[in-house]
């Protein structure tokens, strides 16, 4: 906890949150290294934190992944058998709060089938890479080449 608080004070985390008495966060250096290497970085974070990340990094793509219904969410939480009913009720309450901000995300993905959900996330991310405003360098290069034809 003390080391984490030092990292917060030094602005070494892109995002962080305290959840169920534990700190969670993403080191800035790690994310910057991955992005510079041309890799995508996927963060599983709460809405308030996601919106802060989007403020700091406007190119951030926000995907809201949700089960098909509240009943299914409860069923999955209970089915795990790893949490008490108090924790399940708390998580359901948090889900209700998070759902209030669904429209602030760029995409909504309904996780009815895990593999389909993963494939859809992949398609969305790949599609974002292909958007023209993200490919300015290629576009300019192509225009220059075509001028010489």
Set out the residue ranges of the language-model regions.
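Residue-level signature of catalytic and energy-coupling elements of molecular machines
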Residues: 4, 42, 95, 109
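Short, well-ordered alpha-helical microsegments
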Residues: 49-51, 117-118
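Ras-like small GTPase catalytic G-domain
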Residues: 60, 70-72, 78-100, 115-116
């Amino acid at each position: 906890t003390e080391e984490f608080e030092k990292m917060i004070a030094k602005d070494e985390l892109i995002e962080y949150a305290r959840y169920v008495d534990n700190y969670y966060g993403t080191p800035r250096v790690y994310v910057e290294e991955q992005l510079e290497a041309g890799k995508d970085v996927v963060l599983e974070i709460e809405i308030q934190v996601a919106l802060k990340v989007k403020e700091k990094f406007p190119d951030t793509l926000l995907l809201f992944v949700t089960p098909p219904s509240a009943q299914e969410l409860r069923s999955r939480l209970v089915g795990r058998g790893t949490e008490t009913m108090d924790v399940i009720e708390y998580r359901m309450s948090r889900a209700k709060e998070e759902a209030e901000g669904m429209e602030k995300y760029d995409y909504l993905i309904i996780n009815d089938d895990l593999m389909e959900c993963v494939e859809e996330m992949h398609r969305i991310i790949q599609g974002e890479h292909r958007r023209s405003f993200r490919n300015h360098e290629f576009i300019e290069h192509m225009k220059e080449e075509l001028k010489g034809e």
